[in-house]
Every structure is written in structure tokens, then in C-alpha cells.
Amino acid sequence: MKADHMLEAILNGEINAGIAISGNARQGVLEMPLYTERFYVYLAESCWRKLPVFKPENLEHENMWIMKEAQCLRDSAFSFCKARGKGHHVYEAGSIETLIRIVDENGGYTIIPEMHLPFLTEKQAGNVREIQGDYLSQRRISLYIKDDYIRQRMLNTVADTLKRFVPARMMGEGIVKYGIKL
């Protein structure tokens, strides 16, 4: 479900809450940051640009494979979506795993979120590189609820579940210490 549809469903009472990339401000909806994850470069073995660490200026759009919307960074100076307007490799649907296979077969590189790193094989993990710069190479994930929502216990159950599989260093400090307070 796209973020705007999710927010509409929250406002209409069709769903209680939703999780999406932060920055989807809407009147009547509260946003609670949950965790922040970094992005990494995933390179094909044949990629000529095997730098140990990447800077945004090293990421040329010609060889980049991106998904239609999933890798966009809202309000960022370094947007993976800029390549879309240049007519390069834009993968229309699927998953990060499929995108990695496309890179492995066709060359080039893509951007993958930190939460996907544990799913890589040892060989694939060798093709991952860091991107320098905190703001430019990360995204914040938030929980969205209607502003009059009162089920604090349910929200804390969601937060507690996330704490079990999201590394503590990625979780928001307030969520870790205090949980969600309405």
C-alpha cells in the first residue's frame, strides 16, 4: 500500500495504524519515528567502480538500477529517484532481492536498505559498500496513527515487536526507553 493510500485509510478509520518512510505529514495524522536505517551500495562483481566507501557524487545514474518508488528519499539532496527522469534502468516492480539478481546478471549497482543486509549470501555481502554522509544515506521509518487514536497498548505491542528484530542502534531512543506515549 502506498503511503498516501495508507494515510487516507487511517483518516477514514479503515486501518488503525501504518508504517512508512517518515515525512508524510497530513492533517489529522500523527507521525511517530520508530527507527532509522542506512542505505548501502550493492555492486555487481563486474562493476568497475569497486570503491571501499561511496560518496553521493560517486553514484552515477547511468549504471544504477532502482525500483519505481521504493528507493526514493523524500526531501533529500541525494535522491535515488533523479535517475528516473534521465531514462536509465528503472525497475517497475518486485523486491530488493529481485533487484539484486538483476544487478548480478546485468551489471551496474543498486541501493539497498540496511534491514536487507542479513538476507544476503556471503558472496553478495562482499559486494556491499557504505555510502558516506548521515542525512543523505539514510531514511527514517515512522508509525502513523489518527490524531485521536487512544490504543496506546496496541501501539506499544507493535513497537515491542519491532525492537525484537530491528537492531537497537537503529531504534529511536525515545521508543527504546519509554515506548509510545499518547
Where are these regions (language model features)?
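Secondary-structure junction motif
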Residues: 62-84, 114, 151-160, 169-176
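A late-sequence structural motif
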Residues: 49, 73, 129-171
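Alpha-helix/helix-capping structural signal
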Residues: 4, 46, 71, 97, ...
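Beta-alpha-beta core module
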Residues: 26-33, 37, 51, 98-147
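Short beta-strand and adjacent tight-turn residues that come in two discontinuous sequence segments
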Residues: 1, 15-21, 94, 111-113, ...
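Short beta-strand-to-loop elements that line the ligand-binding cleft
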Residues: 1-2, 21-22, 67, 86-98
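Short beta-strand-centered segments that line the small-molecule binding cleft or hinge
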Residues: 2-39, 52, 128-129
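Short beta-strand elements of ligand-binding domains
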Residues: 17-22, 43-45, 66-68
